[in-house]
Regions:
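Flexible "cap/lid" loop of the alpha/beta hydrolase fold
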Residues: 151, 160-190
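Conserved HGGG/HGGXW glycine-rich cap/lid loop of the alpha/beta-hydrolase fold
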Residues: 60-104
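Conserved alpha/beta-hydrolase catalytic His-Asp/Glu region
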Residues: 177, 191-252
Length: 315
């Protein structure tokens, strides 16, 4: 085969790939949502600028105690939207934050996204909001931040609610392992689309029927914001269990009343981690939800909310 014909075929292959990506709504052809814009913004959507980062959060005022809800990896305040009405119905003052790099918050490139840095930034946000002695509920990565906050800033937390929490070494999910590959950010940007979101959600849910078009759209829109893919790749690359080992060794020091809530069929952080938290925490209650995956607050919101409320009220 002549070099001329070979070059022609290579060009044709690139053109074909370009067209396939274009018509499938992948990476380079996805419209980016500018920072600071929230489609369908609600009255509870708020922003605050702290250290040059514009943080998005939700606030639902109430006469009861402050409950602070913190999301996991590649997630946002959206993950709590089905649980919040039950909590506000009890009169609690509910807060939920998009950490730097997540949801509708800014996703700067000139920064780091490791867990300890995120914890320090959450603490700074709580200072600005004037929050202390909150009921701190964290899912996945948010649970790890809750644990670090309890150890480093005990004045910020009262009761703890760990929902399928990160903390102990585990086998990283595929999407996080992918971030360790060379040129991961560029590859993700090229192929990212609704199909990636759908595939990932089906990993974290036990019941595939819960992965609705509305849910896919909610995650996809937030991951389509400016610098989102960069921020999530940087966060995934920075997940370092060795760096956190000095903290996980101190978990037995925590004396806060703690609810450990786990989806029995969690494919991202297995139930073994839930049992380990139960063993290491002195003042804990472990509740396991059958036929439930990594995000009980989305898959079984009514049950999750009832368990949370009973725990908060001491029932």
């Amino acid at each position: 085969m002549s070099k001329k014909r070979m070059s022609f075929r290579v060009v044709c292959c690139f053109i074909a790939l370009f067209l396939i990506l274009a018509v499938s709504g992948c990476g380079l052809f996805i419209e980016t949502i500018p920072k600071g814009e929230i489609p369908g913004k609600a009255p509870e959507d708020r922003y605050v600028m702290i250290d040059h980062v514009n943080y998005h959060y939700l606030e639902y005022p109430g006469a009861g105690p402050d409950i602070f809800l913190l999301h996991g990896f590649a997630s946002s305040t959206y993950t709590w939207e089905k649980v919040i009405p039950y909590l506000t119905g009890q009169g609690y003052h509910v807060w939920a934050l998009d950490m730097k790099g997540a949801g509708w918050s800014d996703k700067p490139k000139d920064t780091t996204y490791d867990t300890i840095t995120l914890m320090r930034e959450v603490n700074r946000w709580m200072d600005v909001m004037g929050l202390k002695h909150v009921v701190f509920a964290g899912n996945s990565l948010g649970g790890a931040v809750a644990l670090l906050m309890t150890l480093e800033h005990p004045d910020k937390t009262d009761k703890l609610i760990l929902i399928d929490s990160a903390g102990y070494p585990i086998k990283r999910p595929f999407v996080i392992r992918l971030a360790k590959m060379p040129f991961a950010a560029e590859i993700v940007r090229l192929f990212f689309g609704r199909w990636v979101v759908k595939r990932t959600l089906k990993e974290v849910f036990y019941n595939d029927a819960m992965v609705t078009e509305e849910k896919i759209d909610a995650y996809f829109s937030r991951l389509s914001t400016e610098n989102s893919l960069y921020a999530n790749t940087a966060l995934a690359r920075s997940l370092d269990f060795d760096a956190l080992s000095s903290y996980t060794k101190r978990i037995p020091e925590i004396k806060n009343r703690t609810l450990i809530l786990w989806g029995k069929d969690d494919a991202w952080i297995p139930l073994e981690s839930g049992y380990r938290f139960s063993k290491d925490l002195a003042n804990e209650k472990l509740v396991i939800l059958p036929e439930c995956g990594h995000v009980p607050q989305e898959e079984k919101p009514e049950q999750t909310a009832k368990i949370m409320i009973d725990f908060i009220e001491g029932r």
